[in-house]
């Protein structure tokens, strides 16, 4: 409670702002990233699938991705219900706080091929610090799932 400055992600930021109403957001990292990278969002989460599993179960992967897409859309359209459910199954802030945070979470389902430019921009930033952070080089085409 005594920090002058902090870098906080959602839903922690909404929790802080609820407990300390005078708290101000000075810099929005998502907005700064968009300014630096021509409006592109940065990737926050990825689904990684073992190549052998994908070969054996392509329909399962396709159906799973469709469900992830549908779920992400539902969460954005129903933040209160999503917050209530999520608070029951995970150690998260209470629903009133979590429901305020959901619209700020930048939840979006983006297919791998379409996400590739944003993923590569993000990985290049990491590689500038140390190429070892990304395994020495950018992933090749096989890294990005293509629905068939």
Per-region residue spans from a language model:
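A local structural motif
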Residues: 2-4, 22, 96, 113, ...
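Pocket-lining segment of extracytoplasmic ligand-binding domains
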Residues: 2-85
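Short secondary-structure capping/turn micro-motifs that flank functional sites
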Residues: 14-15, 92, 142-143
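A generic structural signal for short, solvent-exposed coil/turn residues
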Residues: 17-18, 39, 99, 135-137
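Poly-acidic low-complexity segments
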Residues: 27-29, 78, 111, 115, ...
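Generic structural "secondary-structure junction" signal
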Residues: 49, 55-56, 104-111, 136, ...
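Secondary-structure end/capping motifs
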Residues: 54-129
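Conserved C-terminal helix/tail region of periplasmic/extracytoplasmic solute-binding proteins
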Residues: 120-148
